[in-house]
Every structure is written in C-alpha cells, then in structure tokens.
Regions:
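Solvent-exposed, polar/charged alpha-helical surfaces in well-ordered, non-transmembrane soluble domains
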Residues: 185, 189, 276, 280-287, ...
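Extracellular serine-dependent O-acyl
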Residues: 297-368
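Structural recognition of the beta-strand scaffold that forms the well-ordered cores
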Residues: 144-148, 153, 195-199, 248-253, ...
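Conserved SGNH/GDSL esterase-like catalytic core that processes O-acyl groups on lipids
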Residues: 46-47, 169-271, 305-309, 346
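N-terminal secretory targeting modules
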Residues: 1-179, 363-368
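A structural motif corresponding to the C-terminal end of an alpha-helix
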Residues: 183-194, 285-297, 319-324
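Active-site segments of SGNH/GDSL-like serine hydrolases
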Residues: 251-260, 282-317
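Surface-exposed acidic, glycine-flexible loop patches that form ligand/cofactor-binding
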Residues: 135-138, 236-246, 287-292, 364-367
C-alpha cells in the first residue's frame, strides 16, 4: 500500500525527443479503450492504462484532454514508483513530464486514468530520449477480470487517508481519486490478472436514478454495453464490442446509489413492487452478460460503504434466483458497515484482501 506520489507539470511538445506513437506495437493497453483511431486511442474508464518498456533517462506522455469537471490528473507508475501529473490544458496536444534524470538503462512506465467521467483523453504517445528505444513488453496476463461498479470500484476519494471511517472532505475536486488503488484493480494485480474496470461514481442500475450525470441521470443499464458512455464525447455514446475481451471473472458491484431519486422520496428496497422491478433490471444485465460470457464466474457484491442490509439481501436473492452455480454472492466482513464516506486506502486494501482470498479459494478452474 506504500506509494510514492509526486506531482509533475506539463509543457508543450518538446523538441529533441523521440515520439513513440500510440499505435506502436510494443505498447501494451489494458481497459475498455476506443481504438477506432489507433494513433489516438481514447481513454474513458477509470483505471484504463498503457504500458511501455524503454531505454533512456526521461519519459513524457503526449495527450489531448477533454475536461468536464474537477481538477485534472493522470497517474503513472515508473519502475515500481507511483506518481501523478496535474494539468489544466484542454482540447490541445500537451506533453506531460513524467520522469527525467533516470539512470541510463531499461525502464518501465504505465500511464493510467485515475478518475472516472470528470474527463476523457486521447493518448498520442510517449516521448523518450532521441537515442532511446522502445522494447517489447511481457505479454498481458492470461487471466481476465471485468468489474462493473460505482465510485468505490473507481477508487473515488480513496487517498483521503485523514478521513478514514469518516465522511468525505468537502470540495475535494477529485484530487483524492485513484482507480489504481480500488479494490477491484488491487485484486486483479494480486491474482495476476488483466482487468477492465467499468466503474463510474454515482451510478445506479436504472437511468434517472442515482447520482451520475445530473440532471439527466445515466444508469448501468445504459452503460454496461458501451465504450463511450456519456453523450458529451466527441463521438457521442458508442457501443462496446464484447468480442474484444472475454473475462474469466465478472465482478458486479452496483446498488449503493440506487435509493436516490432526485426531487422525490428515496426508493425503498423493502417495497415489494420496487424490489421486484429492481431485481429484474439487475438480472437482465447479468443474464445478458452471461450470454456473452458463458464460461465466466460472476461475483455479485456491494462494498463496505454504509448502506442498508436489505440491499445485500436483495442481491443474495438475485444470486439464488438465477440458479447458476457460477453466479455467487460475496459479502465482505464489513459490507455496508465500515464507513459513511468513500473507502480510503486501508479499506480498499481490506476489501481486496478478502476478495482475493475468495477468488483464490475457488481454485484454478475459474480461469480459462
């Protein structure tokens, strides 16, 4: 859990640098990313990343950012040390300085999207020394995970470690968000798996509920099968081709935000009519995913963020009613009880440890 976070600045595209373009075959990508223009892939989802192995003493990333709200930051890991870069230039190509004065030799850098839909960006490439070289990465892990979730799965406010078991700090502007340390992405690293993290803060199952994309709220029923999932993108909302990625394990962690009904009384999962409606919509998503992933293991869950236990009971009912041995309901030791604010780093790692153990206990048979 120990991290080395260092903010860096930005500069215009530098001279006397070698640009490793985004379509270089030695770069490795992970996440639900738009490759319709391979020279400028677009990153929408929290945790999506690109990795490069290179020689030289410096590295920068060239991007074009599209901001919607919050302070804009990207994360990186270079030679095992994590950092972040903060910037405020949008709608033009900029170069983000990641590292300089590295020792001569071989280095590895991963650039990742820390935040969810506060922005998206086009990745143009990495800049390295003029005499530097890009080297082939090791292959991606064979194991594959996909997570559908909300702000907890996206790592929202997880770095506000002075607020453990407390409400979120006011007006934090996204600076504590870090998808790299969401329980889902930690679990994937623990298990040596790839992950596509389809997580968005505030999202509920239904459209017009929850907190995401006010005042025209968008739910997971309209997001789970999308590439760009918000209409403000340059291409608008775009479909995802499920042939591009087939997970061995699907985590489905939606339900935390579902009581919210803006301008009206909250939805009550104890109400029989609403419970049936909500469960049917939840099942519809799972069954559609099951049709696309016939061999996957599905784990239905809610997180340690405080919520009423009736929501956990409803998820348990769904798992039982689907009557599929490879669809299970998992509860953390402190599901719904740990914190009134977003889980911080200790709680994210607590969840990851328990989920890692749960999946490990299923044995190698769950992996393709």
């Amino acid at each position: 859990m120990q991290k080395n976070i260092v903010s860096k600045g930005y500069e215009k595209m530098a001279e006397n640098k070698k640009l490793i373009t985004a379509d270089n075959s030695f770069l490795t990508y992970m996440g639900r990313i738009d490759f319709s223009d391979k020279t400028r892939p677009e990153f929408y989802y929290a945790g999506s990343n690109v990795k490069m192995t290179f020689t030289g003493t410096s590295v920068s990333a060239v991007i074009k950012n599209h901001k919607y709200f919050n302070i804009q930051e990207l994360g990186f890991v270079i030679d095992g040390k994590e950092g972040k870069v903060t910037f405020d230039k949008n709608d033009e190509d900029i170069t983000l300085d990641i590292a300089c004065d590295l020792e001569k030799g071989t280095h590895t850098v991963t650039l990742f999207k820390r935040q969810d839909a506060s922005h998206y960006f086009e990745f143009v490439g990495f800049e390295i020394d003029p005499d530097g070289e890009v080297l082939e990465n090791p292959p991606l892990p064979a194991r594959k995970i996909e997570c559908y979730g909300d702000s907890v799965s996206a790592g929202a406010v997880c770095e506000a470690v002075d607020f453990v078991a407390s409400c979120d700090p006011e007006d934090h502007q996204g600076v504590y968000d870090n998808a790299w340390h969401s329980y889902a992405m930690i679990t994937a690293r623990n298990l040596g798996a790839q992950i596509h993290n389809i997580a968005q803060g505030g999202i509920a199952i239904f459209d017009n509920t929850g907190y995401y994309h006010a005042p025209n709220y968008i739910g997971m029923e309209s997001v789970y099968n999308k590439l760009c999932y918000f209409p403000e993108g340059a291409k608008g909302v775009t479909p995802w081709d499920f042939e591009n990625y087939t997970p061995d394990v699907v985590l489905f962690a939606v339900g935390q935000n579902d009581p919210h009904n803006e301008g009206h009384e909250d939805f009550d999962i104890a109400d029989p009519d609403y419970r049936a409606k909500w469960k049917n919509a939840y099942k519809s998503i799972i069954l559609d995913l099951r049709s696309k992933y016939p061999n996957a293991t599905f784990v239905l869950l809610l997180t340690v963020l405080c919520h009423g236990e009736e929501w956990d009971k409803a998820v348990d009912e769904i798992a039982n009613e689907l009557n599929d041995q490879k669809i299970t309901h998992f509860m953390f030791t402190r599901t719904g009880k740990a914190t009134p604010g977003h889980p911080r780093l200790p709680e994210q790692y607590e969840m990851a440890e328990e989920l890692t153990a749960y999946l490990s206990n299923m044995g190698d048979k769950i992996w393709g």
